[in-house]
Swiss-Prot record:
Residues at which ATP binds: 13-16, 56, 60, 163-164, 169, 172
Descriptive protein name: Uridylate kinase
Lineage: Bacteria, Pseudomonadati, Pseudomonadota, Alphaproteobacteria, Hyphomicrobiales
InterPro entries hit by this protein: AceGlu_kinase-like_sf (IPR036393), Asp/Glu/Uridylate_kinase (IPR001048), Uridylate_kinase (IPR011817), Uridylate_kinase_bac (IPR015963)
Organism: Rhizobium etli (strain ATCC 51251 / DSM 11541 / JCM 21823 / NBRC 15573 / CFN 42)
Entry GO CC: cytosol
């Protein structure tokens, strides 16, 4: 395995649930610090990193709709949850002396900068980790879609999707011990098989922009850096 990173600019997608650890709600600071240390390791390798965090540990917009409420309002609440998570992760990174900026799709200048592609590219060029908050800024779009969109806008060479397991399996390995992990799939195979990697819009957007999706376990300390150098357990979704 090469010690040099395979990718120089990447987008890391982390779910809100990843930040809550074993808790049933909110943010486990120890977990946030550990994820931050993995990102810091990538930065020390010279990799430019953008991050999209979900908000499911705080609120899910679909929960409002399922109870008969307004989906748009619910999604706005979920977007605010992603901003809380982004600020928490930024705090963990700054404790490690990693220069970090939060760019929000929802304008709130007293708290963080507003997103623009120009600001993104500037901060990346200055060596900062850029955390994208607020999803796409629009209801009905998941943070997976936000990850694919921001990856395309920042010119990322790959999307790293940190999940609960170390890749894409034929079935849920926690429920079906005989499930097997795919080493490699195409974007179209993911769509045709209905594999729950990212939502359909996100996978399609990644495919249209020729961005590979690398699925790995976000719970393995040092796993992000290992995969950046070509090692580790993972599934690569790519048409190349």
């Amino acid at each position: 395995m090469s010690l040099e990173p395979v990718y120089k600019r990447v987008l890391l997608k982390a779910s809100g649930e990843a930040l809550m650890g074993a808790q049933g709600f909110g943010i486990d600071v120890t977990v946030a610090d550990r994820i931050a240390s993995d990102i810091a390791e990538a930065r020390h390798m010279g990799v430019e990193v953008g991050v999209v965090v979900g908000g499911g540990n705080i609120f899910r917009g679909v929960a409002v709709a399922s109870k008969g409420g307004d989906r748009v309002t619910g999604d706005h609440m979920g977007m605010l949850g992603t901003i809380i998570n982004a600020l928490a992760l930024a705090t963990s990174l700054r404790k490690l002396n990693i220069d970090t900026v939060v760019l929000s799709a929802i304008s709130m200048p007293e708290i963080c900068e507003s997103f623009s592609q120009r600001a993104t590219l500037y901060h990346l060029s200055m060596g900062r980790v850029v955390i994208f908050a607020g999803g796409t800024g629009n209801p009905f779009f998941t943070t997976d879609s936000a990850a694919a969109l921001r990856a395309a806008e920042m010119g990322a060479q790959a999307i790293f999707k940190g999940t609960q397991v170390d890749g894409i399996y034929t079935a849920d390995p926690k429920k079906y011990p005989d499930a097997t992990r795919f080493d490699r799939l195409t974007h179209q195979e993911v769509l045709d098989r209905g594999l729950a990697v990212m939502d359909v819009a996100a996978v399609a957007l990644a495919r249209e922009n020729s961005i590979p999706i690398i699925v790995f376990s976000i719970h393995e300390k040092g796993g992000f850096a290992e995969i950046l150098t070509g090692g580790g357990l993972k599934t690569i979704v790519s048409d190349n």
